Amino acid sequence: MNFLHSTLDRLREFTPVSNTSTFRTNGQITPEEFVAAGDYLVFKFPTWSWADASPTSKRANYLPAGKQFLVTRGVPCHRRLDDDFAGDAGHDETVVRDGEDFRGDGPHSPGDDEDGWLRTGGLAASQEARVRDVRTVDESGEMGEREDDEDDIPDMEDDDDDDEAIIRDPKADNASSSRRTYTIYIAYTPYYRTPRLYLSGYLSSSQPLPPHLMMEDIVGDYKDKTVTLEDFPYFSNNIKMASIHPCKHASVMKTLLDRADAALKLRREKQRQGKAVPGSKDTGMEGLVDDFEKTKIGDKKAVLEGLKAGGNGNDEWEVLQHDQDFANEEEEVAIRVDQYLVVFLKFMASVTPGIEHDFTMGV
């Protein structure tokens, strides 16, 4: 199956490039917009940089020389997502397709296809708690009061281990070490007209991480489904990397754009009416970090909850910081096209929560 996907992806790279902007209508971007978004990312976060194809014969003619893809190196990853990473275990799995799926329930509802982001439980229609709320349910089925986060509860066993008393085997297998680093690449895909993320891992000894071991750092729901091992198209030596398939990137981005615009419009309307705006302090990218920490990439239902709630005090979406004022508020948008990759990386992090993507973004 992985071979079939890889073959189809290589054929799709020959798709004619479109230079018509559809960023606001469907979440797709043109090569020119990809370059603008890359320039913004590099300017704001210097750990990112542009790179050229090697050899130059691998260059894509729709991108400038020297700006073929984006790269950041040495991104830390300190934990494996093995069986101890519970996630949403114990819940039914749901395939999330495009945003239209939430408007119909039948087998032929819009967006009905086999592809999509796999979401596991915790978001049924009857669930009243938001994605960040964890509640207990008693024997009668009643939902209890919200409990303290387990991270705030000290563990008695934490004090039992004396690190200095532990005898460590220096010859232990490096492949199982918890310390890894990743090089992250962002390339442009002309078929889907979106960015595509590639991951190349290294062991603590700076030795290349075998491709199959990279899957230890991918959330189990996505392994071999939306994340596969692919050759990086801009290198000649066919280096296998973990790649997040871009088939649904545009629809997810469109959902986020719509939600951010709706929140901005509501805030401006309240400001014109002289009303206090709950949670209106501008936290910029920090709002995005908090919003995506516990929301999975296919969790568009949770994203849409903010719109249905009318932007109340629980809606923690914050507008991106603007570098310039807009003369006409009616044309003001929450996320500009040059800020595309910043938001893109935030929801990509939900696939690889063990990789510290924010290490690359000083927020």
Swiss-Prot record:
The active site is at C247 (glycyl thioester intermediate). GO terms for molecular function: Atg8-family ligase activity. Residues 84-174 are annotated as: Disordered. Keywords: Autophagy, Cytoplasm, Protein transport, Transport, Ubl conjugation pathway. One of its GO terms (cellular component) is mitochondrion. It is found in: Cytoplasm. This is Autophagy-related protein 3. It comes from Botryotinia fuckeliana (strain B05.10). The gene is atg3.
